[in-house]
Amino acid sequence: MAEFVRAQIFGTTFEITSRYTDLQPVGMGAFGLVCSAKDQLTSQAVAIKKIMKPFSTPVLSKRTYRELKLLKHLRHENIISLSDIFISPLEDIYFVTELLGTDLHRLLTSRPLEKQFIQYFLYQILRGLKYVHSAGVVHRDLKPSNILVNENCDLKICDFGLARIQDPQMTGYVSTRYYRAPEIMLTWQKYDVEVDIWSAGCIFAEMLEGKPLFPGKDHVNQFSIITELLGTPPDDVIQTICSENTLRFVQSLPKRERQPLSNKFKNAEPQAVDLLENMLVFDPKKRVRAEQALAHPYLAPYHDPTDEPIAEEKFDWSFNDADLPVDTWKIMMYSEILDYHNVDAAAQEQENNGS
C-alpha cells in the first residue's frame, strides 16, 4: 500500500504518495488544482492535477473518466502524457503528467514572438491535431493557455477534459469565446474536427499580431467581429443554422465582404497569410485539415510526412452516451487506474528484460 502525505495548498488538501515532494501551486482550473512537484523515482519535475470531488455527481464522474481514458489513449510527442495516476484515501483523483515551464498564453503576453518560433509552434500544434483527429477525438477547447511549452520550445497540447467524439450531432458551448469556431456559435450542433483548425488559426493569428484576433465581448459581438474581417457567411453555411433565433440574427446583419488578410497582417510573410486564409474559413467543409496544413509551404522547414504519426487505433467512445450512477463510474475509474498500473508495470518489466 502506498504511503500518503498531506499538504495544504490554497486551502485545499493535497493528499499524494510519498513518491512526490516539493509541492508548489502552479494553477487553478474550474475542475482542479495543479501543483508542480519532484518525482523521487525519476528525479523529474512533474505536474500533479487534483480533480476536485470527482465522484460528487454523475456528470463530474463521467468527465473525469473521459479525461482519464483520453490521457491513457493519446500517446504523441505534442500531447501531454500521463506518468502516474492514483486515488487518495479521501477519494480524490490525481493525474501526474510531465511539467513544462510555461504556456503559450504567458509567452504571448510577455513579448512578441519571433517568426521562426511562430512557425515551429504552429507546426507542433498541427502535428498534435493530426494525431488527435486521427484517433476520432476533437479537442474543442484549444486556446493559448492549453498549449504548454518548455525551454527547448517543445510544445504539448493539454486539457482534454472537454474533448468529445467526432459526431455529426455534437452539441455544446465549450471553448473560450475568442477561439470558438463559428459553427459552434451558429448551430450548437453538427460540428467536427474542423473546430480545432479554426481555434488553431485564431492562435496562429495571435502569434503573428501579439493580440487576440476576435476579442468578442459576448456571442453576438464575437460573431460581428468575425464578419467584419471574414465577411458574411455564405448562404449554404447560413442554411445549416438550426436555431431559428440564430438564423434571424445572422440574416439581420448587414452584408459584408471578406477582407484580404494581407491587409490586416501587413508584417507577416505571404505564405503565413495564405495558410491563415485556409484555416479561417466559414464553411467547415472547406477549412484546411491538419495534415493538409502540415504540407503547406509555410511549414516546409519542419514538415516531414514520415514523422507526423497518426493514432494506431480510434478512441473507444462507447461509454460516452452512458447515463450511469456515480458508484458505477467509480468502479470503472478504479478499473482503468488498475489497468494503467498493470500495463505500466508490464512495459517496465519488458524494458528491463530487454536492456
UniProtKB/Swiss-Prot annotation:
- Please, which domain of life does this record's source organism belong to? Eukaryota
Q: Which InterPro entries is this protein grouped with?
A: Kinase-like_dom_sf, MAP_kinase, MAP_kinase_CS, MAPK_p38-like, MAPK_Sty1/Hog1, Prot_kinase_dom, Protein_kinase_ATP_BS, Ser/Thr_kinase_AS
Which residue spans traverse the membrane?
Answer: none
Q: Which residues carry this modification: Phosphotyrosine?
A: Y173
Where is the motif (TXY)?
A: 171-173
Cofactor field:
Mg(2+)
Q: Give the record's GO CC terms.
A: cytoplasm; nucleus
Q: Which residues carry this modification: Phosphothreonine?
A: T171
Gene3D superfamilies, alphabetized: Phosphorylase Kinase, domain 1, Transferase(Phosphotransferase) domain 1
EC number of this enzyme = 2.7.11.24
The Swiss-Prot or TrEMBL record annotates one GO molecular function as: MAP kinase activity
Q: Where does ATP bind?
A: V26, G27, M28, G29, A30, F31, G32, L33, V34, K49
Instruction: Tell me the keywords, alphabetical order.
Output: Activator, ATP-binding, Cytoplasm, Kinase, Nucleotide-binding, Nucleus, Phosphoprotein, Serine/threonine-protein kinase, Transcription, Transcription regulation, Transferase
Q: What does this protein do?
A: Proline-directed serine/threonine-protein kinase involved in a signal transduction pathway that is activated by changes in the osmolarity of the extracellular environment. Controls osmotic regulation of transcription of target genes.
Q: What is known of its domains?
A: The TXY motif contains the threonine and tyrosine residues whose phosphorylation activates the MAP kinases.
- The name this protein carries in UniProt is Mitogen-activated protein kinase HOG1
Q: Which organism is it from?
A: Alternaria brassicicola (Dark leaf spot agent)
Gene giving rise to this polypeptide: HOG1
